[in-house]
Each structure stands twice: as C-alpha cells, then as structure tokens.
Amino acid sequence: MNNKKNHAMKRSPFYLVPLAALLTAACMTPQYNKPVAPIPANFPIAQTDSGPAAVDIGWRAFFKNPELQEVIATALANNRDLKTITLQVEEARALYDIQSADRLPSVNATASESRSRALLTTSTPINRTVYQVGVSVTAFELDLFNRVKNLSAAALAQFMATEEARRSAQILLVGEVSKSWLTERTLYEQVQLAIRTLEGRQASFDLVKKRFDAGITNALELRQSDTLVQSARVSLLALKRQHALSVNALQVLVGTQIQSSASMQSLAKQETLATIGAGLPSELLTQRPDIRAAEQRLRAMQANIAAARAAFFPRIALTAGVGTASTDLSGLFNSGQNTWSFVPSVSLPIFDAGRNKANLKVAEVRSEIAVASYEKTIQVAFREVADALAARATLNDEADAQQAVQKSQSERLVLAQARYQNGIANYLEVLDAERELFTAEQQLLQTKLLNLTNAIDLYRALGGGIQEMSK
C-alpha cells in the first residue's frame, strides 16, 4: 500500500509546488550590487596632515569659541528646517512600521448580534436572533514570492535614507551657522574699521581746511580731502547695510533673535582645528551621510523592482475565524456552540492591460535614476573635499602676504603724511596712501574670513559636525 502511495507521489507533480514556490521566492529577492565609486583613488592635492578624521571631531572641539558654540547649539535646537526633516524621519519610521505589519497576520476580536425574519408558506413568519463572538484573521497574504518582504525592505531603506538625510542636514546647518556667524563678525569689524577710517579722514579734512583758510593750501587739495571723507561715509553706510543683512540671515538659521555685540571676540582671535586628516576618497563613502542616504535610496529602488516582479505571480491570502454562536445570549459559551471558518483564496493576474509591466518598468527606471544620483553624490563630495584641500594649500600663505601688504601700506601712510607736512610731497600722495591702506585692511579681514570658512568647508565635506563631543 505504501509503495503504491510513494509511486503515485513520484508520478504526481503537485508535491513539487511548494519547492517551486520557494525557489521562485529566492529569485524574487534582489541581489544588491553596489555601484563602483566614479572617483580617483587619491585627492589631487597631496596631504601630509595626520590629524584625526573629521567625523571623530565633535563640533565643540572644532569650534573653540564659546560664543560660537552657543549659537550652534541654539540653531540645532530651534532651526525650522532641521525640525522639519526630523519630523520626516519620524514619518518614515511610521511608514516602515505600517509596511512591516503586513508581514504578520492581523487578529481581530469580533462580536455581533443579528436579527432576521423568515417568511414561510406553511406557517407564520419566524423571528430569529443570533449572537456571535470570536477571533478572526482577515486576508493574510502568504508571502511566497517575497512581495511583502521586499516592500518592507524598501520602506526600511527609505527610513534609513531619511535618517541619513537628517544627519546631512545637521552637518550643513552646523557649517552654515558657523560661516554665517563669522561673516557677521567680519562685517562688524569692517564697520568698525570704516568708522575709524571716516574719523581719520574727517580729521585730515579739518586740518586741510585750516591750512586752506590760512592760505597755505589750495582749493583742489580741500576738495580732494572732502571727496575722501564722502567716499568713506559711503563705504560705511554700505557696510552697515551688509552687516544688518548678515544678522538677519544668521537669525533665520539660528531660529531666534541674536545680538551683535562689540564684546564678542574679534575675527583675528577665532580659532578652528587646523589639523584634519583628509584620508582617502574611498573613506567618504562611509563618512558622508548624504552618500549613505543616496545608497539607501538605491537599495529601496532595487527592492521595489523585486516587489514589482512578484506582482506577476499568484497572491495567496487566508481568511479564518473561530468563535461561538447561539440564539440565546446566555447560552453563547455553552458546549457545542463552537463555530469556525477557513477561506483560502488565490489571485492570479491574467489580464491587466499592461499594468504590472508598466509598474516593473517604473521601478527599473527609478533604480537607474537612483544609481545616477548615488554616483553624482559621490562626485560632488569628492569635488568639495578636493576644492577645500586646494584652497587650504595656499590660503595660509595668502593671509601672511596680505598681512604684510597691510603693514607696508600703514607705514607708507605714515611716511606720506610726514612728507606732506614737511612740504616734500603734495596731498595727493597722502590721499592715495589712505585709500590703499583702507583697501588693504578690508582685504585682510576678507582673507582671514576665507581662511576660516575654508577650514569649515573641509570639516563639513569630510563629514564633520554630527558629534557634539569628540570621540
């Protein structure tokens, strides 16, 4: 008897169905292939610094100024853009939880009372009341082809991408706040410089006017001196306007009102951690959250391809229930009142006017877009680091050279004033020296700002700004 049964199973193909389903499901699970990073093995500018990696340096260690640290902390707590993306992370997590719930059956408790009236030809109508209680599982999909699993994987990847995007937004915010704060400090110092310059030129004008009134000098020198005064006044007004705009921009980033004060530390005393190890370009793939976010989005798109492929195969759903029923409420839980139901169903796509094919095509195209976006993100990151390294190679020397220019122009003005007072040179030489000194001092402040902001750009480009304290 058993031999006949075994022989029948060997001839029957139905016992192969579960095995075929498992093999097909394995094919439905995508094999993630990480694209090759389209960047060189090394940065164009050779680096000799052996400092710690930017990701290991907390922003409180990098930005040593206590006032700047307070501004950054306030921005992280109040910035509206960061709040928005933080809420988006919570939304993505909730969507992942919703999608993951589809992988488990939903069990519901039910209770009902139904009343009916039956019309009979042989007797009077009968009124009937039925009470039912029980638990049920409604349309639970047996995920034989990993459709639900891949949709859950896609939702998880989207959640991870959103979390990485939040980290990237924080890095960007820390960098932008610090640069905006330094810009405000620079403009404040330029305003103070313009005020001192205006006062000095006004004093020179008063002296020239006295000489003019005494008949020592001519009207041309008086007008030249007055022109220099008015030029300084125009520069002062323009710088005051720029400073006010910089304060407004900083307040938007910080999310609250801040005060610009003369007691704040001057730009010359600002310090950042200069010894940041650039490392290798390949390390950017793990250091930069925007690259990790792009990779997670790519994972999500590839999981969606597998889910779209699974739509071509049958969907098996189970609906089941167990409980008790009685026409008398008091007898609902008596022996012999048990009820149950078991309703499996299979849905196989036959004709859908090309909907499933179109969905698969959309998923494949979106995956290709995600690959291009991932590669572009890597290239942009490489360029940002390379640009910051190239600038760092010359900015320190440029700042030293500009400092020497400012010193020479200051000495030139002293000599020009002495020559004019001794009658050796005309006043035009003094005016030219004053203009050149003012320009040199403004450029010195700009060079210092550029040097500091470049250090911030390198710190951000290498993934620094997530940790508050150093590891």
Task: Annotate each language-model stretch with its function.
Residues N3, V148, A157, A161-L280, ...:
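Periplasmic alpha-helical coiled-coil/stalk elements that build and connect Gram-negative outer-membrane
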Residues K4-K5, K10-A77, L156, K240-T286, ...:
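Terminal intrinsically disordered/low-complexity segments used for targeting and assembly
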Residues Q31, I57-G58, P66-E67, V71-T74, ...:
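Small/polar-residue-enriched beta-strand and adjacent coil segments characteristic
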Residues N78-N79, A214, N422:
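Charged, alpha-helical scaffolding/interaction elements associated with membrane systems
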Residues N79, R93-Y96, S100-R103, L173, ...:
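Sec/Tat-exported extracytoplasmic proteins
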Residues T84-Q99, A169, L173-R196, G200-F205, ...:
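Amphipathic alpha-helical coiled-coil segments
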Residues N218, Q257, A425-N426, G465:
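Short coil/turn motifs that cap or connect alpha-helices
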